[in-house]
Design a protein with these regions (language model features):
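Bacterial N-terminal signal peptides
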Residues: 8-19
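Acidic, small-residue rich beta-repeat scaffolds with periodic aromatic anchors
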Residues: 26-34, 140-192
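A short beta-strand motif characteristic of beta-propeller blades
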Residues: 30-34, 69-78, 113-118, 158-163
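Beta-strand-rich domains and repeat architectures in extracellular enzymes and scaffolds
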Residues: 33-60, 81-85
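Short coil/turn segments at the loop-to-beta-strand junctions that recur within blades
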Residues: 35-40, 77-83, 118-125, 164-170
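Blade-terminus and WD-like Trp-Asp/Gly-His loop motifs, strongest in beta-propeller folds
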Residues: 43-49, 56, 87-95, 124-133, ...
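Short, solvent-exposed loop/turn segments at conserved positions within beta-propeller repeat blades
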Residues: 55-58, 99-102, 141-147
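Short loop/turn segments that connect beta-strands within beta-propeller blades
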Residues: 65-68, 109-113, 153-157, 192
Length: 192
């Protein structure tokens, strides 16, 4: 038991230090296109464009349904994962993006093999088959105190901050555009 706890702590320490620290440039330009007055919605609807594979979060596993057959995968088993949130399928249907609270965001194959640990990246969404958008956010227990919208290439480990505001949350991709919220504003940027 003690060895398992020590190994878990070592893994957590390594995860906090090593993954996806490579700052880089994924896009050559980030251009602000539009700013509208808006409040942050309390609910967000998932984009279910992919029909051939469906994924849903259920307790401590992820369900993958393909061609009518459902399998359960547990890519980050307990004690590392208490639950899976923000589960989504890549546009090409080959990878699953998910978050484990207090552990970070991961990418795995549809068979459950983890291929990338992205670290701190909340509300992650696919921009394309390689790039993931998310929030690197901090709060005081009730409100965001700082938050950046970040793009991460899960294959190369490149990371780029896309927002210029102190608080930027809940990115939503609509290629080549990305929409996100800043206090009382909906901001649209164009990526090149």
């Amino acid at each position: 038991m003690r060895k398992t706890i020590i190994n878990s702590l070592l893994l957590l320490c390594c995860m906090l230090i090593i993954p996806y620290t490579a700052e880089g440039q994924i896009f050559t330009a980030v251009e602000v296109i539009d700013v509208k007055e808006a409040a942050i919605p309390m609910e967000f609807k998932a984009n279910n464009a992919v029909k051939k594979v469906s994924i849903s979060s259920k307790q401590q596993y992820i369900e993958v349904t393909k061609r009518g057959k459902t399998i359960r995968i547990n890519p980050t088993p307990p004690p590392q994962a208490s639950m899976y949130i923000w589960v989504s399928l890549s546009p090409n249907g080959k990878y699953i993006l998910y978050n484990v609270p207090l552990r970070g965001t991961f990418v795995c194959t549809i068979k459950g093999k983890v291929v990338a640990e992205l670290g701190r990246l909340n509300a992650p969404v696919w921009y394309d088959n390689n790039i993931i958008l998310g929030m690197d956010d901090y709060d005081d227990g009730e409100n965001f105190t700082k938050s950046d919208v970040v793009a991460v290439n899960f294959r190369t480990a490149q990371k780029q901050i896309l927002s210029k505001e102190t608080i930027a949350v809940y990115p939503y991709p609509e290629k080549p555009f990305v929409h996100y919220f800043s206090p009382n504003k909906l901001i649209t940027i164009k990526l090149k």
